[in-house]
Amino acid sequence: MQKGNVWVVDDDSSIRWVLERAITREGMLCRAFEHANDVLKALNSEQPDVLLSDIRMPDMDGLSLLKIIKEQYPTLPVIIMTAHSDLDAAVNAYQQGAFDYLPKPFDIDETLALIERAITHYREQKQPNNAENILQSVSDMIGEAPAMQEVYRIIGRLSRSSISVLINGESGTGKELVAHALHRHSPRALAPFIALNMAAIPKDLIESELFGHEKGAFTGASQVRQGRFEQANGGSLFLDEIGDMPLDIQTRLLRVLAEGQFYRVGGYAPVKVDVRIIAATHQDLEKRVNEGDFREDLYHRLNVIRIQLPPLRDRTEDIPSLARYFLQKTAKELGVETKSLHEQSLKTMMEYVWSGNVRQLENVCRWLTVMTASQEIMPQDLPSEIRLADEKAKNINRLTSQHWSQHLSLWADEALGEGKENILNDALPQFERTLLLSALAYTQGHKQDAARLLGWGRNTLTRKLKELGIEDY
C-alpha cells in the first residue's frame, strides 16, 4: 500500500523542491503546485491524502484556498505553512479547519511526522468540526520561538472550546496576554472578560470580590454588589495567581465549577452563572497540593488544559522583534519618533538574563525611549544593570579555561619577565574593580548591599567608585 499521496502548494520554488524531495524519499507520492487555482482544478479529478499550503501566495492565499477545500472536501486535511508566524495566523488557520499550522523555517523530520499524522487522520475518516468565524483582533503576543509556536497551536485548537485552562509561567512571561487571547479567540469573544489577581487582594475581601454581597451583609455593605462571577457571566473569568487563593475560597470556587451557581455573601438565593475559568500561576501547584496549601480536586478541575509559557531566556531569538515592538508602542503612546537599537546594544540585550522576562524588557524599552537623547540607542545608553552584566560576562569568559589564580600567576610571571616593578599596585585596582562590578551587578546597583557583600563601608565603596573610574553610580 502506498504510504501516502501528498500535495504541496507554495509560490516559492525552493520550498516546493525541498518538500518534494523529502516526501518522495519517504516513499510517498508528491505533487507540487505554484498556484492555489491549479490545486482546485486538480481536485476535480484526484484527491490527495493531505495538502500542505503556504498562507501568502499571489492570486489566492492559503486561507482562501483552505476555506474552499473545507466546503467542498471537508475530510481532506490541510496543513498551513507560513513564514509570518504569529498568533493570529495560527488561530485563523485552526478556525477555518486546518489540520495543523507549520511555521517556517521548519524542521524536515517534524514536517514528515506531521504529514504522516495527517494521512492517518484522513484514512481513519475523522470528520473535523466546521470552523466558525469569530472576532478577530491584533494581539500583543509576539514570538517565533518553537515554544511560542506551541502556545499559538494550543490557543488555536481551543478556539471552538470553553474548557478550563491553567496557564503556568514565571512572572512577566505574559500570562494575562494569553488569557485575553484565549477569550478573544473563543465562542465567548463578545461576552465580558473579567480579571482578578488573587495576590493583590486582602484575604478578607476575596470572597466579596468573587461572589459579591447583599445589602447589610457586613459593616459598610450599603447596597447589593455583583461579584466578578456575575460580571463575567457568559464570558471568561481570569483568576491570576490562583496559587495564592485561600483554602476556604478554593472550596467555594470548586462548588461553583461543579454546580454553576453560588450565593452572594449574606445571600440566601442561588445565583446561576455560565463562566469559563482561565487560571494562571507562577507557582508549582502540584507542590502546593502536596504541601496541603491547594486542594487536589480543584487542581484537577482547573488543570484540564495546561499552557506552559517559556521564560524569555528560553526564547532569546524573540528579543529583537519584542524590543522593536515595545519601542514602537512606547513612541506612539508618547507621541515621539521611534528609536532604533544599535547592533551592539541589541547583542547585549540578547545576552542579558531577563529575570523579569517580557515585562522587564518592555519597561527597559520605555526607559530607553524617555532617557536616550539620540535617535539610535547605543550600548552606553543601556541601563547600568544591563551594561554591568555584560562586562561581568566578558570577564567570566576570559576565565573559563582556568581558575582565576592561574591567570593571575601567568600575568605576574609575564610582568616580572618584562622587568616591570610595583606589579601589586597595577594588579590591585583591577582586582578591586572586578569584585566591585560583580557585587554591583549582583545587587542590581544597590551600593549599600554591594558594600556589605564586599566587607566595606558605604563611604569606602563610594571612594573606590571614584578612584576606579566607575561612573553612573
UniProtKB/Swiss-Prot annotation:
Pfam families: HTH_8, Response_reg, Sigma54_activat. Transmembrane segments: none annotated. Phosphorylated and dephosphorylated by NtrB. GO terms for cellular component: cytoplasm. Keywords: Activator, ATP-binding, Cytoplasm, DNA-binding, Nitrogen fixation, Nucleotide-binding, Phosphoprotein, Repressor, Transcription, Transcription regulation, Two-component regulatory system. Member of the two-component regulatory system NtrB/NtrC, which controls expression of the nitrogen-regulated (ntr) genes in response to nitrogen limitation. Phosphorylated NtrC binds directly to DNA and stimulates the formation of open promoter-sigma54-RNA polymerase complexes. This is DNA-binding transcriptional regulator NtrC. It comes from Proteus hauseri.
